[in-house]
């Protein structure tokens, strides 16, 4: 197979990374995609760093077996815990991670706090500390750990009273006029954006790193002359460690494919 026609591998702790792959498909519809969701081991955000690193390496190995030309670690927690180690081990393949879109949030230049919703591990890791050091001095940044949110989404709960109550409780300390921007620091969270807007004002920007990551993926492929030159729509393959048809169906629903 021509190197350019080989698929791009995406990996996440579950269905969350589909929000990133969706952006990549919009940007590069002619590429072929393989998505590996590790729902069997979700959520990653409450595991130890070593556990997450082991699971990340396992996922990367399984994608390499599928002969992928690039890998997107479409999981904030896995990026925080393992991306540098993964890149060191697999130097010959582009490996792209994802980070909370803090830089983008600062460009909105709105009064109020920049609230970063993320898993507890993402907020504890050095990568996030570096972002805080870079932007924390000039902006009011609030870390909002949302440990249970991934579980809602993994169960296909994207709306409803229970989810709304959970989000209300999380945002209880903050009035709407105290919030400048909300950053979704976990790839699962874009799927509950509409429900979040039932809890906070609709004029508050809610942003995530999906588009920026997809643009970086495209740049890296271009740099290595790996962009697919076919004009037809590419293929999409979804694999999930959970092994159930239900997870595949949920994944297809989230990415709106048949």
UniProtKB/Swiss-Prot annotation:
Q: What class of enzyme is it?
A: isomerase
Per its database record, what is this protein's job? Answer: Provides the (R)-glutamate required for cell wall biosynthesis.
Q: Where is the active site?
A: 75, 186
Q: What protein family is recorded?
A: Belongs to the aspartate/glutamate racemases family.
> What gene does this protein come from?
murI
The source's domain of life comes to: Bacteria
In terms of Gene3D superfamilies, this protein maps to: 3.40.50.1860
A Gene Ontology biological process noted in the UniProt record is: regulation of cell shape
Molecular function terms from GO: glutamate racemase activity
* Name by which UniProt lists this protein: Glutamate racemase
- Origin organism is Clostridium botulinum (strain Eklund 17B / Type B)
Q: Which UniProt keywords apply?
A: Cell shape, Cell wall biogenesis/degradation, Isomerase, Peptidoglycan synthesis
Q: Can you state which reaction this protein catalyses?
A: L-glutamate = D-glutamate
